[in-house]
């Protein structure tokens, strides 16, 4: 109800305001249209066709040895539980958070994006559909805080003081970061992607962990770009 009642603070396409509300709403739309839980639909329609064997919502205990802890509860490490409180209230399955995946699976997904909807088994999504998601949807602007966005993806420029995509990724690049310390950036012009999975959120006593991770992300992206050139 709160999401339905929310009103835009700027016209579409005029300003970038990071928000989870649209993704939460999209997940609910999928649930209502299909009559099935979002995780069931995502597994059948996305994860299995892409061959993503270690991508899932609400991982069971058997997955815990493969999941880095991202928090502490009464002094004990906690892993395999979504950190986002809104997703937690939705049972751990939501359109904006709650998904766990391995580096190998994310790399396979990145290859799928680079090939514009195709993998070794054939084409799964139309090229024009993929391009609709990865093409910048906001006006190009420069300067501090001027972030660009595609549909569900961050685009360039990121508007950050230190870009998580570094300084060398091409203008058509797209990616996303995660609060717990994860990130994926894809450069179609270089046929390059960078996956960086950390558990930054597990360091409650570390100072400036978010700022430092931004710098690390940028440095890793630049190193990968130089290596590919």
Could you say what each language-model-derived stretch is?
Residues 209-229:
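Surface-exposed amphipathic alpha-helical segments
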Residues 200-203:
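A short acidic/small-residue loop/turn micro-motif
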Residues 14, 206-207:
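Short acidic, glycine/proline-rich loop/turn micro-motifs
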Residues 1-172:
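Short, surface-exposed loop or secondary-structure junction motifs
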Residues 98, 173-174, 180-193:
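Short, surface-exposed beta-strand/loop micro-motifs that present aromatic residues
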Residues 195, 205:
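Short, polar N-cap/turn motifs at the start of nucleic acid-interacting alpha helices
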Residues 60-63, 206, 213-216:
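Juxtamembrane/interface motifs at transmembrane-helix termini
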């Amino acid at each position: 109800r709160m999401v339905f009642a929310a009103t835009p603070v700027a016209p579409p396409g005029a300003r970038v305001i990071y928000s989870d509300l649209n993704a939460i709403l999209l997940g609910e739309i999928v649930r209502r249209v299909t009559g099935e839980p979002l995780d069931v639909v995502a597994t059948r329609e996305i994860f299995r066709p892409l061959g993503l064997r270690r991508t899932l919502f609400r991982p069971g205990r058997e997955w815990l040895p493969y999941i880095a802890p991202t928090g502490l509860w009464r002094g004990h490490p906690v892993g395999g539980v979504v950190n986002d409180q809104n997703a937690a209230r939705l049972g751990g399955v939501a359109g904006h958070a709650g998904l766990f995946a391995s580096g190998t699976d994310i790399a396979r997904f990145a290859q799928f994006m680079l090939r514009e909807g195709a993998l070794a088994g054939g084409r799964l999504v139309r090229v024009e559909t993929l391009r609709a998601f990865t093409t910048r949807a906001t006006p190009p602007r420069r300067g501090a805080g001027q972030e660009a966005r595609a549909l569900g993806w961050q685009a360039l420029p990121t508007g950050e003081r230190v870009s998580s995509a570094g300084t060398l990724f091409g203008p058509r690049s797209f990616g996303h970061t995660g609060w717990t310390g994860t990130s994926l950036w894809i450069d179609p012009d270089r046929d390059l992607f960078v996956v960086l999975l950390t558990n930054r959120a597990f360091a409650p006593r570390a100072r400036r962990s978010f700022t430092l991770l931004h710098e690390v992300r940028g440095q890793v992206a630049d190193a990968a770009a130089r290596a590919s050139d």
